[in-house]
Amino acid sequence: MTLPTNVTIVEVGPRDGLQNESPVSTRNKIRLIDLLSDTGLSHIEAGSFVSPKWVPQMADSKEVMQNITRRASVTYSALTPNLQGLEQALDAGANQVAIFTSASEGFCQHNINCSIAESLKRFEPLMVQADKYHVPVRGYLSCVVDCPYDGATSPTQVANISQALIELGCYEVSLGDTIGTGTPNRVKEMLESVLARIPSQRLAVHFHDTWGQALANIYQALSMGITTVDSSVAGLGGCPYAHGASGNVATEDVLYLCQGLGIETGVDLELLAKAGWMISDELQRQPTSKVSQALRHRME
């Protein structure tokens, strides 16, 4: 088994994390992103231009993105559901955007009120406009292992929708285990199916730690050639389908794993942990990251 020498971390805490937490002030969101920008991260998902009616925690994304201190080495991206969201994101200074659909019909209907096929059709005008502006588009694919409504997701279905997103024009597809039920054997089966169609360089993994399997699943993905991992500082973001359970895998834990495996990320673990402590203190809770907790205990 050969592991990659380098891994890119996509920090999703300021968006995917905070949208599932109690509200945080605009000032503290800006502060968090500025701290993260100083850690060596190359990609931070900074906001979302979904209707505030659906995601009220992200209503200030424009103000946040227009007031962060930008580093030339960092990509600041935003989630955009449609053409209007794209225009708003670009106006706010996003230099990359992301679209989202699901590998499961049930989740697609519950989450974005349409079929998978309809969701892909809706993205076509956005993709045309993004191409016109030379803005890269990332595709998020939810429920690649299981769905809270439909049960197990077929690996072939995951491969089909991943391929559709690539054909639509996405430079990369992030494969999301939305309810965190995946285990390495199931992740292996899913990735084998997707990798038969799409090269590893155009795939990322996005694991939730709801059932404590995220790091094991990331290790499995790394062993299969995946070199981009989504994660959230301090483990921000609960799981909306399991009340009180953890959601996104913590960036600190992923960094420690990579460090131990001799994989370069370019990210300073201690600086990132400090950013996590700041936002966790604001939220008045502990980081879900075990590495973060151990580091804080050691430094106190």
Residue ranges and their predicted role:
Residues 1-300:
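Catalytic cores and adjacent flexible loops of soluble metabolic enzymes
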